[in-house]
Amino acid sequence: MNIIVTANTVPFIHGGADYHIEGLIEELKIRGHQVESIRFPFRFNPDSELVNLMAFCESQNYTCPNGKMVDRIISLQFPAYGVNHPNHVIWLMHQHREAYDLYPNDPTSEQTVLRDQIVDYDNRTISAAAKVYANSICVSERLQKFNQINSVPLYHPPYAWKQFYNQESQDFIFFPSRLEQLKRQGLLIEAAQHLESPVKIIIGGSGGQGNAYQAKIDTLDLADKVRLIGRFSEQEKFTYYAQCLAVFFAPKDEDYGYITLEAMLSSKPVITCTDSGGPLEFVEDQVTGYVCDPDPKAIARVIDKLYADKQKAKSMGQAGHRKYHAANVSWDNVIETLLGPL
């Protein structure tokens, strides 16, 4: 097939979304398809930038650009899914959450106008697609709740999924993620002051909250318990996963979350929270990890439990590894689904 993948690009910001986009393109090419990607430059302010980009995307028809027939469009992100094609499949990473679950309680009149424009755009363009998939149950439920649009959850593997491995655990908890408020590294930092065990905390990644988190560590006198290691290589990532006692991943209402899957591929238990969204689709309390309240003391208690019973920690990690493979999280399934009959 001749396939176009549409998505966004944000200069100088690279993360899980890029792995998702690039992974899909690579897997399509491996299977012999001709693939082009069209990535629209995304700017979230001023508001006029979003409005203009929505209008531009919706004006694009890729049925036969420059006389070249396109068999299928696969769109991944807002507002890139506004493009037109009769065989258009949307595989939704997430919508523009600031117009939905992250919409402020006391919006300005400008925010209300923009929100209405985005909701109208989503209702119109997503409904026009031949098929709609979501990258998790969480995203699918959000789309149904706010837009009354049905979608089918479709899981995919994390980047370099074959390279994760397991080693004997050491006494540290690993949390790799962007340092942002929604990822809630602060919960784990605050939990460290309540630990009774000698377990250390290693937090990897960079982001806008880096200085604030370091200040919190210093203020709480936790320099001997918590380390911010900043950016790390892929090989370092695999090693941290392989050697940790457990992985902490408790964002607020996460869309999907590669970190959960990476931990399971490394046969490590996952600590998450009751309001974390995507991770809850894989983490079963006391089976593949722990699901606790988003409270530092509750988090500290389960970390101490893991230290006190390392055999149980190992068993939960192995259960997570089995659960991952039982869920058919594979690119074969993804490609077969996205290119199936419409």
Predicted regions and their residues:
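Aromatic "clamp/platform" in nucleotide-sugar-dependent glycosyltransferases that forms part
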Residues: 252
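Membrane-proximal helix-turn-helix segments that form the acceptor-binding/catalytic region
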Residues: 108-132, 140-141
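Conserved acidic donor-binding segment of nucleotide-sugar-dependent glycosyltransferases
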Residues: 285-286, 290-297, 305-310
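Glycosyltransferase donor-sugar binding loop
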Residues: 200-214, 230
